[in-house]
Swiss-Prot record:
Keyword Secreted in annotation: yes
Species: Notemigonus crysoleucas (Golden shiner)
Main location: secreted
InterPro entries (UniProt xref): Ependymin (IPR001299), Ependymin_CS (IPR018224)
GO biological process terms, semicolon-separated: cell-matrix adhesion
PROSITE patterns: EPENDYMIN_1 (PS00898), EPENDYMIN_2 (PS00899)
Known partners and oligomeric status: Forms disulfide-linked dimers.
Protein name, per record: Ependymin
UniProt keyword list: Calcium, Disulfide bond, Glycoprotein, Secreted, Signal
Gene that specifies this protein: epd
Signal peptide as annotated in the record: 1-20
Keyword Calcium among record annotations: yes
Length: 214
């Protein structure tokens, strides 16, 4: 939390300039971020909740679902977006599934063609520490016949919430306790038992959003 406050102080001048701008370019995530991510369907069904780590420079993402969730299996995925590789990891049985990922956009980073929609306060804009200024971005994903929105902090570009509306599913993302750091850099390294595993075929529109379903 102290680190996030420091980021806001450092970038306060930039934020003030951006506030007055009528046309904003998508901001960039910090080099490293981590926290809790929760995904639900628009019907209110809990789909996933767990800890995420994201390396924006290397474009790598790790998500480990909470084991106390009322589910028979728990998601542990590692995605190397630039390489187009998705690992589904089973650490208990030391097994690994590897798939190609042709569609590489996701909600951990604002796509470069996103449109700035608004800048708003969540909570109070006048009471100290009782409000959060966020920027709302939106855009289309024509390859998936879908559109999305993403809210980030005005200072620091940390994820706050997001939504995905497609032909097959609608998803809502929430991010909590986000910090501009990752405790374990090995989170982005596939386990040794993933070495030598052959790629499994996946459709051309296979994406980050396919991970979350009932």
């Amino acid at each position: 939390m102290h680190t996030v406050k420091l980021l806001c102080v450092v970038f306060s001048c930039l934020c003030a300039v951006a506030w007055a701008s009528s046309h904003r370019q998508p901001c960039h995530s910090p080099p490293l971020t981590s926290g809790t991510m929760k995904v639900v369907s628009t019907g209110g069904h809990d789909l996933a909740s767990g800890e995420f780590s994201y390396d924006s420079k290397a474009s790598k993402f790790r998500f480990v679902e909470d084991t106390h969730a009322n589910k028979t299996s728990h998601m542990d995925v590692l995605i190397h977006f630039e390489e187009g590789t998705l690992y589904e990891i089973d650490s208990k049985n030391e097994s690994c599934k590897k798939e190609t990922l042709q569609f590489r956009k996701h909600l951990m980073e604002i796509p470069p063609d996103a449109t700035h929609e608004s800048e708003i306060y969540m909570g109070s804009p006048t009471v100290i520490e009782q409000g959060l200024r966020v920027r709302v971005w939106h855009g289309k994903l024509p390859e998936l016949h879908a559109h999305y929105s993403l809210s980030t902090t005005s200072c620091g570009c940390l994820p706050v919430s997001g939504s995905f509306y497609g032909k097959k599913k609608d998803l809502l993302f929430s991010f909590f306790g986000v910090e501009p750091e990752v405790d374990d850099p090995q989170a982005f390294v596939p386990p040794a038992y993933c070495e030598g595993v052959s790629f499994e075929e996946a459709p051309d529109d296979h994406s980050f959003f396919d991970l979350f379903h009932d």
